[in-house]
Amino acid sequence: MAKQEKQPKSARQKIRIRLKGYDQRLLDRSTGDIVETAKRTGAAIAGPIPLPTSCEKFTVLRSPNIDRKSREQFEIRTHRRLIDILNPTSKTIDALKTLTLPAGVDIKIKA
């Protein structure tokens, strides 16, 4: 068996992509597109890793005048995913730049 060469940590490259959105299906579809694009160009993938969902609740009065006890609650759930692309090539970076994602997905990329 051939031994794998270990590269020093400074020589390894990694792109970390964090996705955030309110719609879980849209977010999963976007992560699938990113993973498929990266694998097609020959990069190694770690993820998608589901991060904890944050839930923000808002309480409002149902009536503007009376009946303070009558309230209604709304919540916004923010779903998050993490993808690491290990040892990306120039093809990978170009393919990710041309990738179009839906409007409901926020993306942050760290190199």
UniProtKB/Swiss-Prot annotation:
PROSITE patterns: RIBOSOMAL_S10. The keyword Ribosomal protein applies. One of its GO terms (molecular function) is structural constituent of ribosome. The keyword Ribosomal protein applies. Keywords: Ribonucleoprotein, Ribosomal protein. One of its GO terms (cellular component) is ribonucleoprotein complex. SUPFAM superfamilies: Ribosomal protein S10. One of its GO terms (biological process) is translation. Part of the 30S ribosomal subunit. Belongs to the universal ribosomal protein uS10 family. Involved in the binding of tRNA to the ribosomes. This is Small ribosomal subunit protein uS10. It comes from Protochlamydia amoebophila (strain UWE25). The gene is rpsJ.
